[in-house]
């Protein structure tokens, strides 16, 4: 149990640091919608698609590695709380259309990126057989 907690914690720390770094690098580029949070969620969506597909296809991958990557790293990278807070700020500022655009970009974008990640894994798996 302690090993599992350590793996999740290490993964989550790494994911959160990457999310913070993306915010530092990207949030000032386009002020209406913080691009760092969007990039974190889209990248996380893509990587979750790859990871889920890979773990389903490769039964030799142990549950600890799944917890490290999916629960830990990708859980720390993606962020519903920051997304929600940013939408709240937009709504408080009466920027309804910007809030709606951000919601669509985050939710639909993450789902599309997840499907692209799954497709990428399927394509790579076919190419390297």
From Swiss-Prot:
InterPro entries: FluC. It catalyses: fluoride(in) = fluoride(out). Pfam families: CRCB. GO terms for molecular function: fluoride channel activity; metal ion binding. The keyword Protein biosynthesis does not apply. Fluoride-specific ion channel. Important for reducing fluoride concentration in the cell, thus reducing its toxicity. One of its GO terms (biological process) is cellular detoxification of fluoride. GO terms for cellular component: plasma membrane. Belongs to the fluoride channel Fluc/FEX (TC 1.A.43) family. It comes from the Bacteria. Na(+) is not transported, but it plays an essential structural role and its presence is essential for fluoride channel function. It is found in: Cell inner membrane. This is Fluoride-specific ion channel FluC. It is a multi-pass membrane protein. The chain crosses the membrane at residues 20-40, 67-87, 96-116. Its main location: membrane. Keywords: Cell inner membrane, Cell membrane, Ion channel, Ion transport, Membrane, Metal-binding, Sodium, Transmembrane, Transmembrane helix, Transport. Signal peptide: none annotated. It comes from Desulfovibrio desulfuricans (strain ATCC 27774 / DSM 6949 / MB).
